């Protein structure tokens, strides 16, 4: 039988996210819907709160940086949870049946908290600094040195293209090796928080003839002169969240 009750360990997180939706997001939701492209300054406090919860382990893995991938492909639990050191799988809480493990605790905590904040305002939820799709990608696959360098910075994700949509296996943006550098050329659209973020994780292909196997992701500084902002979209909804379009023109990245 499917149990639809919220696990007890997540109840405090859900209540806190619900309070944020009611007390922070709802009062300013209409304001930022009308003031499209204006950054919601209230989110600075929200992001600081999330950072503090993540650092303390109180978030139970919620948030972009809350879950990394173990070598076996399971979600690694945050440091404060009871997890097996070898697999990163959360052990059963006291009182639960032996043999049961939670392989998706971080995903569940993120989903439950996002459900609450989206009730407050979807656009504001998508605009929380350091909680972008790019941050989730960095947390999931970056090495320790990359996490140290980029972990505390806001990262957007650039996958979608005008001619391919979000079909990642058909990406046309290219990354060409040139000595110690990669040179990226192409176009990206529908980049959530692309103009506001400090970094953009760009998906590009090393060789179009190889299909998905040649698709790689590159962390690009938003200030890189080769990453040119074309426009911010004017939308019918979710207007508190900016959606950007970029052109990459001979964007140079040093291969480290």
Segments (PLM) and residue ranges:
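Amphipathic, small/basic residue-rich leader segments at the start of a protein or domain
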Residues: 1-128, 149
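A short, Trp-centered hydrophobic/proline-enriched beta-strand micro-motif
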Residues: 152-161
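N-terminal glycine-rich flavin-associated loop
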Residues: 96, 114-115, 122-145, 165-168
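Flexible, small-/acidic-enriched active-site or ligand-binding loops
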Residues: 225-250
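Short Gly/Pro-enriched turn/cap motifs at secondary-structure boundaries
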Residues: 102, 127, 163-166, 190-193, ...
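A short core secondary-structure module
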Residues: 181, 185-228
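Conserved small/polar residues in nucleotide/adenosyl-binding loops
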Residues: 254-256
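A structural signal for short hydrophobic beta-strand segments in well-ordered beta-sheet cores
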Residues: 175-176
